[in-house]
A protein has these predicted regions:
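N-terminal amphipathic/basic leader segments beginning at the initiator methionine
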Residues: 1-21
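Mg2+-dependent prenyl diphosphate-binding active-site environment of isoprenoid biosynthetic enzymes
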Residues: 21, 25-128
């Protein structure tokens, strides 16, 4: 991968993170608090990197790639939250899990919130 491609990937990752914040934005203080916590340490962005590579091979509008990458990361995060609920996990990525920090009900609702907001964002792609 050339320097130019790495520079483009870094820019792409930044745009995806911004899109994730946009998708999960809420005026609800509980949702905002949990979103800020979860998105502060979102992971390695492997799915985003795969979308970037895929997008560099075929001709897809950058805006759509950003939406797809953000959606893939948010769906992954929601599955991790629900997985932590099922496993009653206390720690994820060296931090307390959503269930450990906010309890069962808020963890379930937040995981569902992520799914819902993500699929709403994906639905808007279908019409473009």
């Amino acid at each position: 991968m050339s320097f130019h491609e790495v520079e483009n990937l870094t820019e792409f990752l930044d745009e995806v993170k911004l899109k994730m914040l946009n998708i999960t934005g809420s005026s609800n203080k509980n949702i905002k608090e949990i979103s800020d916590y979860v998105l502060a340490n979102p992971g390695k962005f492997i799915r985003t990197q795969l979308v970037f590579i895929y997008g560099s091979v075929i001709d897809i509008e950058k805006r759509k790639l950003i939406e797809l990458a953000a959606a893939s990361e948010l769906i992954h995060l929601s599955t991790l939250i629900h997985d932590d609920i099922i496993d009653e996990a206390k720690i994820r990525r060296n931090k307390p899990t959503v269930i450990a920090k906010w309890g069962l009900k808020k963890a379930i609702l937040y995981g569902d919130f992520l799914y819902t907001k993500t699929f709403q964002a994906l639905n808007s792609l279908e019409n473009t």
